[in-house]
Amino acid sequence: MNTMILSEYLSVLIFFIFSFGLSCIILGLSYVLATQNADTEKLSPYECGFNPFDDARGAFDVRFYLVAILFIIFDLEVAFLFPWAVALSDVTIFGFWTMFIFLLILTVGFIYEWKKGALDWE
């Protein structure tokens, strides 16, 4: 029984060994043959002003986190809005007013953040 199972899976084992060996050879060749010259474009700072090879634990402005949180909130708003828009023909008046209140709360929150200066980048 064991020899029968071994003979059935021998081709799979050979395939895995061959693919592992081939991937190691390809990775090794790309490492040996690739040019290691860093060009000036790769070393230039990102659009946000950070250098690509600085310490990752450096000082980081808190406003980036605020913008990220605001993006997530409004991205989730869109994620909730898509299924509602797809099923708009089947939505009752209760569903319409529920979405209207949802959008109104988010709009009031956005105006509040704007008035408090959360979106100002001084």
Swiss-Prot record:
It comes from the Eukaryota. Its EC number is 7.1.1.2. Keywords: Electron transport, Membrane, Mitochondrion, NAD, Respiratory chain, Translocase, Transmembrane, Transmembrane helix, Transport, Ubiquinone. InterPro entries: NAD(P)H_OxRDtase_bac/plastid, NADH_UbQ/plastoQ_OxRdtase_su3, NDAH_ubi_oxred_su3_sf. Belongs to the complex I subunit 3 family. One of its GO terms (cellular component) is mitochondrial membrane. GO terms for molecular function: NADH dehydrogenase (ubiquinone) activity. PANTHER family: NADH-UBIQUINONE OXIDOREDUCTASE CHAIN 3. It is an enzyme of class 7 (translocase). This is NADH-ubiquinone oxidoreductase chain 3. It catalyses: a ubiquinone + NADH + 5 H(+)(in) = a ubiquinol + NAD(+) + 4 H(+)(out). It is found in: Mitochondrion membrane. It comes from Reclinomonas americana. The chain crosses the membrane at residues 12-32, 66-86, 91-111. It is a multi-pass membrane protein. Pfam families: Oxidored_q4.
